[in-house]
Amino acid sequence: ILHSGQPLVLGAFTITPLASRHFQFPDPEMVATMLTDAEIPEPLVPPVSAFDYKLGEAWVLHVSHPKGSFLIVGSAGFIPGQLAGMDVDVVFLGVGGIGSQTADYRMQFWSETVGRISPERIIPIHWDSLTGPLDGPMTGEIRIAGFLSRGADETLAFLKARAAENSAVTLQTLPRFEEVILFP
């Protein structure tokens, strides 16, 4: 069981979970369906509707190791000031659905995540549909897929523009099915 702010030591790794906020869906129906009553009363046996799954809690994970540190911000939600002063080399930045948000929200999200931690590398995550085949393009035909990818061009342009403002930051995407070494 995770406790916000309580570090877990696993060998050379220290993992500190931080309770966070989930991305706020601008669509009231999606809020009601996915964020309200987030408990799943009994095990789900696929195939089931994507809306049978609930979002539950959102967490940020800070992982430190003698070779470097990284932060996993799984959702495009945030708690103002929460990440201030953290030492982070790489951030895995959850940006799913952020293209459907306002420009002000995107700027505030950037300021409260990347702006607070000043990482050397930003790796966007949680932006695909989560439903496409592993050997094909990551797309899907369900409603959530359309939502997550909505504004994808705008999201990518936003990330590139913000990263370009700071030459010390590199924006990188992960290759599929290839080993990635964060800290050589």
Model-found features: residue ranges?
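Surface-exposed cleft-lining segments at the edges of enzyme active sites
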Residues: V45-A50, L93-G99
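Alpha-helical scaffolding within the catalytic cores
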Residues: A76-P80, R106-E112
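Extracytoplasmic/secreted cell-surface and envelope-processing proteins
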Residues: S100-A103, G132-L134
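Amphipathic coiled-coil/heptad-repeat helices and related helical stalk/stem segments
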Residues: G56-E57, R106-M107, T155
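Binuclear metal-ion centers of metallo-dependent hydrolases, dominated by the metallo-beta-lactamase
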Residues: I1-P7, A84-G85, S111-P184
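Active-site neighborhood of phospho(di)ester-bond hydrolases with catalytic His/Asp-centered motifs
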Residues: L71-A76, V91-G96, T102, R121-W127, ...
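Core dinuclear metal-dependent hydrolase active-site scaffold
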Residues: H3-G85, R176-P184
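A conditional alpha-helix N-cap/helix-loop micro-motif detector
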Residues: D52-K54, A103, A152
